[in-house]
Regions:
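RecA-like helicase/translocase P-loop NTPase motor core
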Residues: 1-367
Length: 367
């Protein structure tokens, strides 16, 4: 049995009876330089404490290390020797970023290479968008639009920045805007199932914006990319994190085409469904909106793109990263250094290209 992305597994898995190391062999695969399990409102020690490295069976794990960078190894034969050397150097630099070898450990900062940054005079959000989504509104066939969008994304650390970027990019498309408001309700969490809308009016419920949930006012256009937020039909490729391109819109159903993966090109139908938010929401009620389980995907949060490759990559670092591995994950989505465009401020200690890089050496040293 192989378990991918083991760095996201909570240590509590060891409390189950699913793993018997005496009789079974379990392969755990993952890169511990990437982001770790999310602990709402948790601090460094809280996050480290829930990692699988703190499990009771970790002492029995035999560590094997991969040594060949497949992105470099699989580069097209048409690439010159100089391009291959550049790709190798970029891959080595990414490893150093992930290991925290390049940054100031006191301030958790690193200075990014000049050629990754937007040039002086172009350090604006519109220029970042233009560097990634140039010719966005050029007329294309559906297949061409899918090919264009699947290779592009702008990443940000915080969801509010992702929402702002998505809205700005969507308005660059000249096709008709369709707005789908959710029907929000709340239920008493005591278990009675009684509605609590009298205490929490719909205007307040509509204003709640929580990670992993669709927006109250979902704005979409035909030809825009979306990301699925729920597992609707994993066997058909409709999983949490699946990216699709909208082909048709109606009040209760979105028709969209899957962009990547083994189901790429498959036409799917996404219904408007009742959702529920209760566990760990820190709300005094259970939020139950009726909405399409999707968000725009021109821009995405860094934590959502682990495992994906992006050919034309933009990074919005005006708001710096805040957790272990986020900078490494963001930078390593690109295969080519020339395909990365980074927007950040030069206000940190007056140094050009300086940004935050959080690396938990306590975790890396255990693997």
């Amino acid at each position: 049995m192989v378990w991918w992305t083991s760095y996201l597994i909570l240590r509590c898995v060891s409390t189950t009876n699913l793993i018997d190391l005496t009789f079974y062999s379990l392969s755990l695969s993952g890169d511990w330089r990437q982001t770790l399990p999310v602990v709402p409102k948790g601090y460094k020690l809280d996050i480290i404490a829930v990692c699988v490295t703190k499990s009771s069976f970790w002492h029995a794990v035999n560590h094997l290390r991969l040594t060949v960078n497949m992105r470099v190894h699989n580069r097209d034969d048409s690439c010159s020797q100089a391009q291959r050397l550049q790709a190798t150097a970029f891959a080595d630099w990414l490893i150093s970023v992930g290991d925290g070898l390049l940054h100031d450990p006191e301030n958790e900062t690193v200075v990014l290479p000049e050629d990754l940054l937007l040039p002086p005079g172009r350090k604006t959000i519109p220029q970042l968008i233009e560097s990634v989504y140039k010719d966005l509104d050029v007329g294309r066939t559906e297949a061409q639009q899918i090919q264009y969008l699947c290779n592009r994304a702008i990443l940000a650390a915080r969801n509010r920045d992702v929402d702002d970027l998505n809205s700005a990019i969507l308005h660059r498309m000249t096709s008709d805007m369709h707005i789908f408001p959710s029907a929000d309700s709340s239920v008493d969490p005591s278990g009675t199932g009684m509605p609590s809308n009298t205490l929490f009016p719909s205007e307040f419920l509509n204003s709640i914006n929580i990670s992993g949930f669709p927006l109250h006012r979902l704005s979409l256009k035909i030809g825009c990319p979306i990301m699925l937020l729920r597992n609707l039909d994993p066997a058909a490729g409709l999983c949490n994190g699946t990216r699709l391109v909208v082909s048709q819109l109606s009040r209760w159903v979105i028709e969209a085409v899957i962009m990547t993966g083994p189901h790429a090109g498959k036409r799917s139908f996404i219904p408007c469904i009742p959702l529920s938010l209760s566990d760990n929401s820190r709300l005094p009620f259970n939020l139950q909106p009726l909405q399409f389980p999707v968000r725009l995907a021109f821009a995405m949060s860094i934590n959502k793109v682990q495992g994906q490759s992006i050919r034309h990559l933009g990074l919005y670092l005006i708001e710096e990263i805040f957790s272990h591995g986020q900078l490494y994950v963001a930078l390593s989505r690109a295969e080519n250094k020339a395909d990365v465009s980074i927007l950040l401020n030069d206000t940190n200690a007056g140094l050009h290209g300086m940004t935050r890089n959080v690396v938990y050496q306590d975790v890396l040293q255990t693997v």
